[in-house]
Amino acid sequence: QTAVPTPAPGQVLLRTVYLSLDPYMRGRMSDAASYAASVAVGEPMVGATVCRVQSSQNEKFAVGDWVLAYTGWQDFAVSDGSGLTKLDPGMGSVSYALGVMGMPGFTAYMGLLDIGAPKAGETVVVAAATGAVGSVVGQIAKLKGCRVVGIAGGAEKCKSAMEDLGF
């Protein structure tokens, strides 16, 4: 437990409402060499968050604004505003910024369309089909006119892949 920080001039106080739990974070919990730096024991896990501005001394942000931040897994954080992206709750749930409209969605989009480049009528096989990336890959493939075969672990996930996602 730490005290809630007080923002200085030019800063905002953010309250974390949603945090992202992504597979790459497993590598951050190890001292082994990885593409993502490890997190020291006792420090907050690094990662994307959706936060609400609690107080502001920064003219670009008002109390109540929703932002995408990289403040890590902590209840409160102070930011000078750099690296924050305002979110419009009128465009859908702000939590989408951590999923379909965030890193998992971008990974699915670029991986499938830029690298996979599927064509209508082809079959796309998706591993981890009910996960954050796989479910989006399958949906994009369906939009491209592909037949999607989803692979998932266990009867419940397989049922969801078929009934909820249409794979």
Give the ranges of each region predicted by the language model.
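Glycine-rich beta-strand-centered segment in the early N-terminal region that forms part
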Residues: 2-21, 29-73
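NAD(P)H dinucleotide-binding glycine-rich loop of Rossmann-like/cofactor-binding domains
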Residues: 45-52, 60-128
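Mid-domain Rossmann-like dinucleotide-binding core that forms the NAD(H)/NADP(H) cofactor-binding site
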Residues: 98-167
